[in-house]
A protein has these predicted regions:
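Glycine-centered loop-to-beta-strand initiation motif
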Residues: 142-150, 156
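Short, acidic Ser/Thr/Gly-rich low-complexity loop/linker segments typical of extracellular
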Residues: 131-145
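Extracellular Ig-like/FN3 beta-sandwich strand-entry sites
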Residues: 119, 154-157
Length: 157
């Protein structure tokens, strides 16, 4: 529930080849096979998210959808999908500052979401509403997709 609160708070700021692996009867493939096929071999969820979010828009994979959920990273391609667990006690909050428009966004897509302000210098302050603790206070630059992401404690509000 607290992850939802963090996501809701972030939304106030957002605008939001190898051969094909053999699927099983239910359309799934092994996680290792899937990750290898998409150039993500040996990466954990943090590394995959960081890699995909920082990719130049023109270099993004067109055959992969990567969706950050509350407790997991859902990766899908064609009729195959795998889930990679997020680290315990952390959640990923992706923010896209905007000038003219935004939209409701429940799950950040690392491969399809585009914000308005790509490669822009910004100042970000994230404060835990319950404790007043400043979790992030830094000057940073948005990624090529117009977003910037932060790993936060999942109990922060």
């Amino acid at each position: 529930m607290k992850r939802a609160a963090i996501a809701a708070a972030a939304l106030a700021l957002t605008g939001c080849s190898a051969a094909d692996p053999e699927p099983t009867a239910d359309g799934t493939v092994s996680q290792d096979t899937f990750l290898t096929t998409h150039g993500l071999a040996a990466m954990d969820a943090v590394e995959i998210i960081d890699h995909l979010d920082r990719q130049k828009v023109t270099e993004r994979p067109t055959d992969l959808i990567a969706s950050v959920r509350a407790d997991e990273l859902l990766l899908s391609s064609d009729d195959q999908e795998v889930v990679v667990d997020l680290p315990d006690n952390q959640t990923y909050v992706s923010i896209a500052p905007y000038l003219t428009s935004t939209h409701d966004c429940f799950y950040h897509s690392l491969t399809t979401c585009l914000g308005e302000l790509d490669n822009e210098d910004i100042q970000v302050t994230i404060t835990d509403e319950a404790t007043g603790e400043v979790l992030v206070d830094e000057a940073t630059t948005t990624f090529d997709n117009g977003f910037i992401g932060f790993w936060l404690p999942d109990d922060a509000t």
